[in-house]
Amino acid sequence: MKKSYSPYSKFPVGVAGLVNDGRIVSGCNVENASYGLTLCAECSMVSNLAMTGGGRILAVVCVDKNGELLSPCGRCRQLLFEHGGKELQLLTPDGPQPMSVILPWGFGPDDLPQ
């Protein structure tokens, strides 16, 4: 959370993901004065995943500065679906939930023609 760059919203977000090879990858939000360019924590986590060898994300937890669970925005749900699939588990206030519940009609690589 200390690495979050959130001078505008004052709302730091941190995320961690378990990768299929046992690694933990993390990320934080990085804001921009042009708000549309802000990167969500999940975006930096997926970048971290790619930079450290790739793999599939098995489980994710996203929290605010107090450790309260947060729900990813729609863009980030799609990003998590791409890198973890329907089986990825997201920690929610109701316990772990698969992406198939969080994003029931997710669009992914299997939906594209070969």
Positions of the model-derived regions?
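C-terminal binding/interaction regions
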Residues: 1-6, 52-114
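Short beta-strand scaffold segments in enzyme catalytic cores
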Residues: 8-19
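Gly/Ser/Thr-rich helix-start
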Residues: 15, 28, 37, 75
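Histidine- and/or cysteine-centered catalytic micro-motif in compact active-site loops
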Residues: 18-20, 29-30
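Compact, glycine-rich, soluble single-domain proteins
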Residues: 29-43
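A general structural signal for well-ordered alpha-helical segments in protein cores
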Residues: 42-46, 73
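Basic DNA-binding helix
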Residues: 49
